[in-house]
Amino acid sequence: MKLRIKFRKYGPVRFIGHLDVMRFFQKANRRAELDVAYTGGFSPHQIMSFAAPLGVGLTSNGEYMDLEVHSLTSCEDVKQRLNAASVPGIEITSVKILPDKAGNAMASVAAAGYTVAFREGRDPHFDLSSAVDRFLAKDEILITKETKKGSREINLKEGI
């Protein structure tokens, strides 16, 4: 059965990269003594996947991880055991059982909201609100994307 785990990442843990967060959860799952499913083969790994990785230095109140387990007592028990095995800066906020045909966590993320905070005395020297309004009022926001096959222009306005 597959679980969708929602967690917070905050405080000093915000400076930990995505691969280290994955390793943390592998160890936390073992410490919490969860009945995690493993891949077959010569080098078995826990079957888990994350939604979009959070950039280094950013905090989040809504990160998602899918974890496959063989059995569980209850979602609340999994939440408590993982929180007990966790470190300050990572907190499990919810655990849900997913239907068998549910998509992965990444496919479930439709949008993200960001909040920008400035340190005291470090406010921008321009009106941020009007700058954002001018930016969003543009008909096109073109950037050049460089790939192995060459470069091409992309209109960011379609994704905003």
Regions found by a protein language model. Name each.
Residues 9-13, 71-73, 120-122:
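A generic structural motif
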Residues 37-69, 99:
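Short, charge-patterned binding micro-sites
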Residues 75-160:
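Internal, well-folded beta-alpha domain core
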Residues 1, 32, 44-46, 61-65, ...:
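A generic structural signal for short beta-strands and their flanking turns/coil linkers
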Residues 3-9, 65-67, 109-118:
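Short glycine-/aliphatic-rich beta-strand segments at the starts of folded cytosolic domains
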Residues 35-38, 77:
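Flexible helix-coil linker/hinge segments at domain or subdomain boundaries
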